[in-house]
């Protein structure tokens, strides 16, 4: 192994895969919706995805992936989601296990609960294996 070689970060790869699944579901089921993946390194805490639905309403979604009950949400993300909780801001967590995938949806005002309790916090919506991403997007 070269000392300058950087290892791929599996968490980001899983999050990118989650984004690809949502993007495909949008394209296949809601062609009149628009979604943009945001690069939030410049603005800490800003959610990962900005979506405009067919009515012109805006939604922001923080994407998270995990292989256990914990959710790695930063204090900046908690602050943003809590501050903007009156709007349509969401945390979408994809749990990957040996038996498949599940998606947990939490409204932004639940960010503190998700930070402290992880997936033990009661979700606003829960989708079991196999995940129907059309239903996730309609939630």
State each model region's role.
Residues 1-5, 120-139:
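Charged phosphate-binding loop/patch that engages nucleotide di/tri-phosphates or the phosphate backbone
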Residues 1-40, 54, 139:
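Acidic-basic catalytic patches of nuclease active cores, encompassing PD-(D/E)XK
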Residues 45:
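Beta-rich catalytic cores
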Residues 49-51, 57-67:
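Conserved catalytic cores of phosphodiester-cleaving nucleases, focusing on short active-site segments
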Residues 54-56, 97-98:
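Short strand-connecting beta-turns/loops that link adjacent beta-strands
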Residues 66-84:
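Mg2+/Mn2+-dependent nuclease catalytic core
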Residues 84-111:
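Nucleic-acid nuclease catalytic cores
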Residues 111-118:
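Acidic, Ser/Thr-rich peripheral helices and adjacent loops at domain boundaries
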């Amino acid at each position: 192994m070269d000392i300058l070689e950087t290892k791929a970060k599996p968490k980001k790869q899983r999050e990118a895969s989650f984004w690809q699944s949502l993007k495909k579901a949008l394209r296949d089921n809601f062609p009149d919706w628009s979604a943009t993946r945001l690069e939030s390194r410049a603005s800490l805490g800003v959610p990962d995805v900005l979506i405009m639905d067919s009515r012109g309403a805006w939604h922001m979604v923080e994407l998270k992936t995990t292989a256990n009950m914990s959710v790695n949400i930063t204090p900046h993300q908690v602050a943003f989601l809590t501050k903007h909780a009156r709007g349509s801001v969401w945390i979408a967590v994809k749990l990957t296990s040996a038996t498949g995938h599940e998606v947990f949806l939490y409204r932004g005002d639940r960010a503190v609960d998700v930070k402290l309790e992880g997936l033990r916090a009661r979700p606003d919506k829960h989708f079991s294996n196999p995940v129907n991403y059309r239903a996730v997007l309609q939630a």
